[in-house]
Amino acid sequence: MEVSREIIEKLEIFQKLVKKWNKSINLVSGNTIHNFWQRHILDSLQLMQYIDNKEIHLVDIGSGAGFPGIVLSIAGVAKVSLIEADLRKCIFLEKASKISNNNIQIINQRIEKVAIDCSILTCRAFSKLNTIFNCIKNISVQEKVLLLKGKNYLTEIVAAKEMWLFDYLIHQSITCEEGKILEVSNLTKII
């Protein structure tokens, strides 16, 4: 995955900020700090290969430490809205948003209460598919939902298919053998 020197420098600044704030508000698991670049930065950055047009509005739910939302903004996504219920994490996200040259909006609310339109929605390390789909029912996603998932992704798909109609593609993560990227479109709740 090729990125410019400027983007790498900004991602390194972001990495330092996450590590600094992690001491006080536990943004990422302590056992991932030693492998930070692959575990967090590249894991988020790999989503860029599924974003055809950078001039979009992307919504990242449960943004926490800014993965993948801040990383995708630094990589060139024009407008990113980060939805996070924890005020302390929103304060961190506000600081981190200054690293990007692009438009970042921080929304300090529970996801279920946010009504917003976007081209693409992302989330990472948030919840099971059914929970995610229920949380985003007020968010109008025009194009697709990109989800970074772990080894239980197939079980989650089967369970979600009982309550939702959707199309999906499964992509292999470049950072983890068990990791998958689910690309979901045409999401509709079964009545």
From Swiss-Prot:
Named from the GO MF annotations, one term is:
rRNA (guanine-N7-)-methyltransferase activity
Record's Gene Ontology CC terms?
cytosol
Q: Which EC class, in a word?
A: transferase
| Highest taxon in the source lineage | Bacteria
| Enzyme Commission code | 2.1.1.170
- Report whether rRNA processing shows up as a keyword of the record: yes
* Record-linked InterPro entries: rRNA_ssu_MeTfrase_G (IPR003682), SAM-dependent_MTases_sf (IPR029063)
> Which of this chain's residues are annotated to bind S-adenosyl-L-methionine?
62, 67, 111-112, 124
> What Gene3D superfamilies does the entry give?
Vaccinia Virus protein VP39
Entry-linked NCBIfam families: rsmG_gidB
Query: To which protein family does this belong?
Result: Belongs to the methyltransferase superfamily. RNA methyltransferase RsmG family.
Its recorded name reads Ribosomal RNA small subunit methyltransferase G
Give the species. Answer: Rickettsia akari (strain Hartford)
